[in-house]
Amino acid sequence: MLKKNKKANSNNSNATAYSPLAYLKRPYFKRSKACPLEQCPNEDIDYKNKTLLSKFTSEYGRILPSRITSVSSRKQRLLSTAVKRARYLALLPYC
């Protein structure tokens, strides 16, 4: 029969890595909450505006999420429909 290790229940040196203080020391940065499209009211979200749409797509042609671009949810919906229309008309690549 195998004997169970009695030291498994004792305090381990790895237990300090999961302490709440370890999470406080993690570096992070805050993104600006302002929508970049609200700052320029002259910019229209249109499927023909390739330069604007390419700013919000990745290098592989995927639409970037709003948590990365900090675009408001309403503008994100308008961007996604404009990108999809531009893809359909072959103004933007699918991939």
UniProtKB/Swiss-Prot annotation:
The keyword Metal-binding does not apply. The keyword Cytoplasm does not apply. It comes from the Bacteria. GO terms for biological process: translation. GO terms for cellular component: cytosolic small ribosomal subunit. Keywords: Ribonucleoprotein, Ribosomal protein, RNA-binding, rRNA-binding. Gene3D superfamilies: Ribosomal protein S18. Coiled coil: none annotated. GO terms for molecular function: small ribosomal subunit rRNA binding; structural constituent of ribosome. Belongs to the bacterial ribosomal protein bS18 family. Part of the 30S ribosomal subunit. Forms a tight heterodimer with protein bS6. PANTHER family: 30S RIBOSOMAL PROTEIN S18 (PTHR13479), SMALL RIBOSOMAL SUBUNIT PROTEIN BS18M (PTHR13479:SF40). Binds as a heterodimer with protein bS6 to the central domain of the 16S rRNA, where it helps stabilize the platform of the 30S subunit. This is Small ribosomal subunit protein bS18. It comes from Ehrlichia canis (strain Jake).
